Amino acid sequence: MSKTITKGSLTKEQVDFYNLEGFLVLEDFLNDDDLAGVRASMAARVNEIATDLLTAGLITNTFADSPFELRLAHLFEGLDDKAFLKYGRSWRDRLPGYFDLMANPKILDAIESLIGPEIFSNPVYNTRPKVPKVAAGAVPWHQDKSYWPDANANPVITVWVPLVDATLENGCLH
């Protein structure tokens, strides 16, 4: 099978799949260097949450020595739904690492393949930690396009970037 390249970084086959199915999975698309800034921003946010949880008496261990991939899950293990929703449902921090990820040329090139070169990002975005075995804060499949009246004439694409391997065991998009 030939790999016809479209304008942007995706192949014609990938674009056709997206247009037919409405989604596209690009495994190993971003490398550790691409994710370093957003992981650092996320780690700083997790440090703040650990301090808040400890100060509030909701945890006795900040799991400071836990690896990035596990620390947040460890912090949230014993929390009830109310505490989880306060600290883990939706982060709207404006941190440099998040912006760097949104402006990553690989991501923008892939999006260009799907909608063309006129790309803008809505300033309302969420960082939603997906923690294994936590149902609180789950968000069902939906389309954000309805939130923006002017969007009906334009394509809207959501880019989901897991910062750790997304598996059934450790939490994945479903």
Where are these regions (language model features)?
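Catalytic core of non-heme Fe(II) oxygenases with the double-stranded beta-helix
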Residues: R94, D109-E112, A135-H174
